[in-house]
């Protein structure tokens, strides 16, 4: 029966079991554009059943603009346009009903007119294979088209699908279009009186050229009911454009699959989420050209808790951004010592914005073509090392499983990667062989100028076989080791700050980063695993540092594995032990392989098998290194050891780095004549996309890594190993660049009362009562290298703004550039930092005299003390830190050293950023009956007693060492190592005056 219904007063969603057929609201018989009401998306009732004579309203998208790939569990078709047209349905037996007559009312200008046709055939089969989506409470049917449809003509913003909870918005302008089939809906009525039967074969339609992935995605549509095919076929025969071949880089939009309800009812009508509203949406590479209105452009970011899962957001809420721009200060000059630090350009992440959850975004340039799928872009050739050829640079490694599956992936971040400035990481490994550090390491760290002097944002340095003898370990426990001091001195002028360090005997790992990246490096943790002597000795094993950089979990693992040719299986077991034992706390990645990116490097001690010494040297001399690759144990193990699955390494285009004669570039000429081998290696692994969501709730395939150089440095000859360095470029699909704390300070302090700091904290920040704000000089070396500090108060001053003031006594005198930083006890790093500002305060006589005395004492130090104790480090303890220099980022300087028994009852409650520098109340030694002091109890100039003196047998008793406590004596109290010579003989720490004099002149004194 054909005809037009004039009743449309009832709203959709009410049952149409009796009376006239209800018309969807907004569908009229005038020429005005029709409007599809959002109530079409109401969820279906689970137990509703249609009457035997109840007609069903079928909606089928027609035209190339409505073509979408069907998911594996059932299609969810978005309404392509609010322009419905009439199309009859066919019965399952293949009998077609009469096609609706085309009249003047169905002209393209009269968009809202409908022609309703009823069919007395049997009802279509249930949606068991995803062919029909029919809410039983509405009687709506949206069958998929039988057979593949034409590809989309364009992918503009008007095709942005909407989520279930959002209403559809009509397009900005609806004008006449050449055909109705291009953007219309096919509506038909089907009675449901007969049991379902298999549908008939649909009419043949020209099929576009599809990729294998798209054909598999469209396979369920081939079993759709014939009722949908007639409506679209009749429309296509009239005015559908001819299909064109579909390029490999273009694909249908893939809405996520949705299963049926628990009672077996078909799923409700569900469209793809709106990219402007859904947090799970990611930019797609289908669009060939970007426009300011294109939904694939990046959006402002929003920091989410680490345990937030994916899901559609509520209306009005912010969506997490894909990317926000980050600044990169000007590159330092090519000089070894760069000029003074200029103020870095203002960054959206460091400047106040209108909303704390948003920062402005920079869309891609209009003339920048988006990359096609299946192509990989190599990094800039300028970053290649001198001894590598451009054609040998490795291709970028992405987290996607393969490039062929990217076309069907529901998310791709390639357009975002294209606009990401990148984050450069340099990794260095060096077995120093207990040697003293060289004078200069700028070439090793790529800091001596050139194209890549400004390329590093983070530097990881792994050392092995650092001198760990007992006397060296005692000095290193009190002061920073020489190697750490060397790298801090070299990197400090280039704005690098020590983020974290960990040491296990001779294995050390140092992690540096530019100071302006510190607010975006969080959750810093370290761990170590011993594997020497069955796990009881730390000469072999691994140390690691993990952190979150811009919301991405990174882990750096420095290992020293067993040596010798026949210990390959033992090296494998040790590596497995390290991976299994090292665990981290917190909601982030717990195991090493759970991180988004893992760097594994160190002296892995893999050797070259089969070939003898003469052939190996011949291959090296004749530059035939490829013959040695095949017999390298690590290369062979990559194919056989499951533990190495996913680890990648750049080409070994440099000569083996072991073993050399110390001081030369000649391989071992000793009696052992060790065979050269690539023992020092750098590998990386990106978390597989199938590893589940990341700790932040986003998908794991969101990181791209490119290795720009992988080389050895033959110019360093202090060890029998050559150092190896690699440079990487990381491109993030999104950046969490919202600082947790924002500091506000005046541009210049010329009076002490101007030393006021105001700061604001985000609601997600977990603050601690041990947080503090430090004042640093420009070029500071680590987070505890401050000039002054003040505890962070948490009393609300103005809304969410807090304020602290530095005391006049703690402020530095004179003129200089300084930086303020908020140190988080929970994150173990500066999470808020300011731009450089100036302090110009008049110097006082007290400050000048203190400086003169400090300089005099420094001149009295011997050469060994100056070599061990570098003078540029600041004390991590706030007490008296402005007057004295410390030698370690973990311990304070010792103007006077007191050894006394440790007592829990006598521990003071002094709060300090460094727990090692807590000071105890001074207790004078017992006095004899005649009032004279015994031993070293002579009082100093200020009346305070001197340090204790123990009998000669005390230093020889090692059992007493754990009960001793190292403590800082008040420098103003005159506590010195030199008591009266007369009282030294019976109770001196050393059995002879010469021994005491040596201790006074040694490395522990000022």
Curated annotation (Swiss-Prot):
Ranges where the record places region Catalytic: 425-728
Residue ranges of the motif RSXSXX motif 3: 874-879
Location of Asymmetric dimethylarginine modifications: 56, 76, 83
Gene3D superfamilies: 2.60.40.2840, Endonuclease/exonuclease/phosphatase
Family matches, as SMART domains: IPPc
Motif interval(s): RSXSXX motif 2: 350-355
Subcellular location: Cytoplasm
GO molecular function: inositol trisphosphate phosphatase activity; inositol-1,3,4,5-tetrakisphosphate 5-phosphatase activity; inositol-1,4,5-trisphosphate 5-phosphatase activity; phosphatidylinositol-3,4,5-trisphosphate 5-phosphatase activity; phosphatidylinositol-4,5-bisphosphate 5-phosphatase activity; SH3 domain binding
Polar residues composition-biased segments: 27-41, 94-112, 256-273
GO biological process: inositol phosphate metabolic process; negative regulation of microtubule polymerization; negative regulation of neuron projection development; phosphatidylinositol biosynthetic process; phosphatidylinositol dephosphorylation
GO annotation, cellular component aspect: cytoplasm; cytosol; dendritic shaft; growth cone; neuron projection; plasma membrane; ruffle
EC number assigned by the record: 3.1.3.36, 3.1.3.56
Required for ruffle localization, as annotated region: 729-840
Ranges spanned by the short sequence motif RSXSXX motif 5, renumbered to the chain: 911-916
Motif extent (RSXSXX motif 4): 885-890
Domain topic, free-text comment: The 5 Arg-Ser-Xaa-Ser-Xaa-Xaa (RSXSXX) motifs may constitute binding sites for the 14-3-3 protein.
Protein name, entry field: Phosphatidylinositol 4,5-bisphosphate 5-phosphatase A
Protein species of origin: Homo sapiens
């Amino acid at each position: 029966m054909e005809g037009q219904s004039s009743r449309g007063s009832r709203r959709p969603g009410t049952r149409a079991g009796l009376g006239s057929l209800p018309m969807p609201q907004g569908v009229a018989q005038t020429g005005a554009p029709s409007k599809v009401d959002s109530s079409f998306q109401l969820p279906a009732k689970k137990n509703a059943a249609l009457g035997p004579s109840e007609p069903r309203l079928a909606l089928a998208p027609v035209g190339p603009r409505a073509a979408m790939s069907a998911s594996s569990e059932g299609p969810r078709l978005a309404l392509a346009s609010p322009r419905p047209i009439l199309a009859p349905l066919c019965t399952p037996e293949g009998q077609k009903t009469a096609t609706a007559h085309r009249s003047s009312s169905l002209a393209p200008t009269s968009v809202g007119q409908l022609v309703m046709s009823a069919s007395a055939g049997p009802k279509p089969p249930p949606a068991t294979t995803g062919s029909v989506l029919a809410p039983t409470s509405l009687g709506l049917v949206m069958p998929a088209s039988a057979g593949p449809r034409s590809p989309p003509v364009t992918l503009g913003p008007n095709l942005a699908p909407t989520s279930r909870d959002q209403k559809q918005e009509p397009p900005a302008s609806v004008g006449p279009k050449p055909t109705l089939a291009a953007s219309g809906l096919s509506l038909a009525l089907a009675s449901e009186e007969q049991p379902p039967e298999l549908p008939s074969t649909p009419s043949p339609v020209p099929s576009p050229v599809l990729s294998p992935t798209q054909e598999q995605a469209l396979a369920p549509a081939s079993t759709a009911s014939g009722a949908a095919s007639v409506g679209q076929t009749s429309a296509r025969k009239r005015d559908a454009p001819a299909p064109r071949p579909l390029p490999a880089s273009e694909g249908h939009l893939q809405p996520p699959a949705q299963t049926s309800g628990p009672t077996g009812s078909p799923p409700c009508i569900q469209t793809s989420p709106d990219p402007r509203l859904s947090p799970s949406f990611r930019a797609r590479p289908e669009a060939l050209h970007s426009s300011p209105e294109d939904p694939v452009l990046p959006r402002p970011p929003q920091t989410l808790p680490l345990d937030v899962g994916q899901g559609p957001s509520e209306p009005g809420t912010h969506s997490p951004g894909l990317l926000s721009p980050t600044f990169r200060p000007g590159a330092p000059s090519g000089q070894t010592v760069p000029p003074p630090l200029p103020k870095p350009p203002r960054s959206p992440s460091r400047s106040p914005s209108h909303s704390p959850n948003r920062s402005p975004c920079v869309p891609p340039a209009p003339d920048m073509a988006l990359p096609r799928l299946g192509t990989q872009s190599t990094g800039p050739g300028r970053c290649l090392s001198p001894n590598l050829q451009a054609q040998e640079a490795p291709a970028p490694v992405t987290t996607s499983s393969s490039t062929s599956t990217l076309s069907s992936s529901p998310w791709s971040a390639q357009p975002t990667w294209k606009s990401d400035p990148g984050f450069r990481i340099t990794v260095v490994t060096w077995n120093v062989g207990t040697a003293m550090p060289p004078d200069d390491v700028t070439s090793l760290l790529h800091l001596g100028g050139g194209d890549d002097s400004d390329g590093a944002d983070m530097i990881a340095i792994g050392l092995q076989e650092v001198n760990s003898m007992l006397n060296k370990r005692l000095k290193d426990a009190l002061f920073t080791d020489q190697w750490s001091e060397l790298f801090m001195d070299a990197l400090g002028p280039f704005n690098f700050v020590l983020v974290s360090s960990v040491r296990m005997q001779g294995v050390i790992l140092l992690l540096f980063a530019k100071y302006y990246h510190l607010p975006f490096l969080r959750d810093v943790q370290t761990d170590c695993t011993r594997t020497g002597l069955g796990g009881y000795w730390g000469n072999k094993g691994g140390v690691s540092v993990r952190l979150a950089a811009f919301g991405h979990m990174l882990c750096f693992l420095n290992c020293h594995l067993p040596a010798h040719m026949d210990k390959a299986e033992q090296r494998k077991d040790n590596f497995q032990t390290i991976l299994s034992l090292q665990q981290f706390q917190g909601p982030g990645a717990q195991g090493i392989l759970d991180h988004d990116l893992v760097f594994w490097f160190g002296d892995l001690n893999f050797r070259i098998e089969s070939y003898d010494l003469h052939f190996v040297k011949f291959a090296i001399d004749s530059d035939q290194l490829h013959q040695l690759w095949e017999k390298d144990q690590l290369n062979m193990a990559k194919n056989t050891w499951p533990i190495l699955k996913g680890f990648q390494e750049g080409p070994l285009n440099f000569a083996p780095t072991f073993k050399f004669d110390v001081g030369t570039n000649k391989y071992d000429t000793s009696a052992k004549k060790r065979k050269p081998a690539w023992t020092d290696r750098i590998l990386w692994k990106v978390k597989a996309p199938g590893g589940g969501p990341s700790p932040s709730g986003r998908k794991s395939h969101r990181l791209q890594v490119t290795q720009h150089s992988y080389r050895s440095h033959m110019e360093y000859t202090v060890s029998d190993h050559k150092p190896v360095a690699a440079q990487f470029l990381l491109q993030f699909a999104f950046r969490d660049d919202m600082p947790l704390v924002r500091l506000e300070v005046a541009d210049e302090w010329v009076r002490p009362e101007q030393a006021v700091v105001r700061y604001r904290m985000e609601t997600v920040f977990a603050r601690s009562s041990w947080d503090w704000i430090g004042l640093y000089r420009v070029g500071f070396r680590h987070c505890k290298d401050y000039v002054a500090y003040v505890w962070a108060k948490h009393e609300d001053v103005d809304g969410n703004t807090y304020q602290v003031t530095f005391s006049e006594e703690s402020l530095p005198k004179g003129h200089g550039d300084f930086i303020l930083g908020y140190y988080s006890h929970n994150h173990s790093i500066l999470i808020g930092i300011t731009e450089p500002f100036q302090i110009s305060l008049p110097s006082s006589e007290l400050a000048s005299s203190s400086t003169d005395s400090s300089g005099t004492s420094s001149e009295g130090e011997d050469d060994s003390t100056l070599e061990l104790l570098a003078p540029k480090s600041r004390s991590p303890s706030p007490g008296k830190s402005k007057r004295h220099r410390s030698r370690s980022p973990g311990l304070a300087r010792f103007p006077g050293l007191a050894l006394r028994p440790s007592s829990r009852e006598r521990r003071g409650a002094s709060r300090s950023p460094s727990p090692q520098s807590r000071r105890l109340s001074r207790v004078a030694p017992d006095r004899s009956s005649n009032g004279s002091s015994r031993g070293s109890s002579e009082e100093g100039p200020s009346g305070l007693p001197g340090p204790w003196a123990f009998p000669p047998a005390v230093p020889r008793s090692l059992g007493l060492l754990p009960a001793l406590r190292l403590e800082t004596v008040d420098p103003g109290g005159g506590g010195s190592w030199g008591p009266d010579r007369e009282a030294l003989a019976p109770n001196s720490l050393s059995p002879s005056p010469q021994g005491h004099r040596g201790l006074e002149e040694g490395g522990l004194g000022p």
